[in-house]
Amino acid sequence: ITEAGCNNRTAFIDNPAGINQTGYKILPEYLKTNFFDIIILAIGINDLQRFFNPTLNEFEQGMEKLIQITKNLSPKSKIILICPSKLNLAGINNGIFSYQFDKISVEKSGKLSPIYKSLAEKYKCHFIDLNNIVEVSSLDGLHFSPKSHKTIAENLYKNLKQTI
């Protein structure tokens, strides 16, 4: 198991913080040096930050690019694509992430499920939609509570058993 999560990492937008914060740039480094039976792509919400502001079409193209990189560099790996839960506007507005996310970010986050589902079908990825499982915490509008993390883990475990 290689855990490659990173705070504030974007999936497909060039992050001003550099290569380690930009998913499509750092992903090949992991894929070229490791063999993975299963790759979990649970990324994308940071691309909706107000100063990046991609259209939904750009979002879809960016996530597709990430899947294509994964398929090209690790063709035998199975992919689980995880759609993030919709952001919580009240939590965003009242929390520490209001400088990064806004009402438009929240609205777009609520429209990601069909994009992820369509890409999962197109590229034959397993698909988990967190919107059907948990909501983000109202404390910051972005992250999950410990209870929600447990629920996500249990659902991911079930999916992994089916995938293997």
Task: Please state what every model-predicted region is.
Residues 88-130:
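Substrate-gating cap/lid alpha-helix
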Residues 1-75, 107-110, 143:
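Conserved SGNH/GDSL esterase-like catalytic core that processes O-acyl groups on lipids
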Residues 25-26, 58, 65, 115, ...:
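Alpha-helical elements of Rossmann-like donor-binding domains used by nucleotide-donor carbohydrate transfer enzymes
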Residues 3-5, 83, 129-131:
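Residue-level recognition of beta-strand->loop/alpha-helix junctions
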Residues 42-48, 69-106:
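Active-site segments of SGNH/GDSL-like serine hydrolases
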Residues 33-42, 78-83, 123-128:
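Short coil-to-beta-strand
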Residues 1, 140-164:
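Histidine-centered active-site loop/cap adjacent to the catalytic His
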Residues 10-11, 48-50, 88-93, 135-138:
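Short acidic/His/Gly/Ser-rich catalytic and metal-binding motifs that mark active-site loops
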